[in-house]
């Protein structure tokens, strides 16, 4: 669900799709997916598409402008996520570690910062592995120092996009309040307008916490929610998390400005691949045990 769905078509259909820009919704499962990859059986021709709710057709997803500075999407799903960010207000990027969802989100956010956004707000639940509470008080240091460990994934992504000088640029943007790091538990009472708000590791939130954060986002803003439903550090079950409740709600599915996509291709080490395979095996085992107990 939410993955880039593959549809095999004839070469002439690919050619026509590029000419006309739309195609009949042949085998697309538009109830579970929004993005599609049309490809020939030999894999030599392909095109990305998105489902148009109003026409019921698949429309061509143009990828030429989907890049920023040192960033360019590495696969079809990353291209679809970047496109979704440019064309929607609420976007959920799903995927395991190494799929590039944070890098794609930040590339879009930095692009918007240079265009018309007032600032970028970076959030993340402050949860250690195995802990159930979100709190930063126990960590030594001032507010900025406390956040550095939690926000490291953002720094890593910025370095990929900006290069070695990212620390200098980041310092300037922070001084001007154009990039703001916010502890997740301090979002209550905040209100963000004309901003790009990114919430990473959303699988570690409760439904109440995530919905509270969503309610803080105001006019002319984009909210990007990132997470991996299968890697939860907060002690919650997958179905109890805010991320899971959000993407499986009827309201989200029917919302005209909300979309979700799952990234699956990993660009990390073989060790990271192994960890993900083990996580998936354990999840499948737990689901089988739960089914047998019902």
In which residue ranges do the predicted regions lie?
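Interdomain "pre-motor" coupling segment immediately N-terminal to P-loop NTPase/helicase cores
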Residues: 1-61
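Conserved helicase motor core of SF1/SF2 NTP-dependent helicases
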Residues: 1-5, 13-16, 67-71, 75-196, ...
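Short glycine/proline-rich turn/loop motifs
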Residues: 62-66
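Walker B catalytic carboxylates
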Residues: 200
């Amino acid at each position: 669900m939410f993955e880039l769905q593959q549809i095999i078509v004839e070469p002439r259909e690919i050619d026509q799709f590029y000419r006309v820009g739309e195609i009949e919704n042949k085998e697309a499962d538009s109830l579970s997916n929004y993005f599609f990859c049309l490809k020939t059986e030999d894999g030599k021709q392909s095109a990305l598409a998105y489902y148009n709710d109003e026409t019921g057709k698949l429309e061509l997803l143009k990828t030429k402008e989907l890049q920023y500075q040192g960033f360019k999407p590495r696969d079809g799903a990353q291209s679809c996520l970047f496109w979704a960010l440019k064309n929607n207000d609420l976007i959920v990027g799903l995927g395991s570690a190494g799929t590039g969802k944070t890098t794609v989100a930040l590339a879009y956010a930095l692009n918007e910062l240079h265009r018309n956004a007032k600032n970028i707000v970076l959030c993340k639940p402050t949860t250690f592995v195995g802990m159930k509470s979100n709190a930063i008080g126990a960590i030594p240091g001032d507010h900025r120092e406390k956040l550095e460990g939690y926000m490291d994934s953002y720094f890593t992504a910025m370095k990929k996009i900006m290069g070695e000088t990212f620390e200098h640029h980041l310092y300037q943007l922070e001084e001007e309040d154009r990039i703001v790091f916010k502890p997740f538990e301090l979002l209550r009472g905040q209100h963000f307008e004309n901003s790009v708000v990114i919430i990473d590791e959303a699988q570690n939130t409760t439904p109440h916490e995530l919905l509270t954060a969503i309610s803080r986002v105001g006019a002319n803003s984009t909210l990007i929610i990132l997470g991996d439903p299968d890697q939860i550090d907060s002690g919650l079950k997958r179905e109890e998390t805010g991320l899971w409740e959000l993407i499986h709600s009827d309201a989200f599915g029917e919302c005209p400005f909300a979309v979700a996509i799952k990234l699956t291709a990993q660009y990390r080490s073989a060790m990271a691949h192994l960890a993900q395979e083990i996580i998936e095996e354990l999840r499948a085992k737990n689901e089988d045990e739960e089914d047998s107990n019902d």
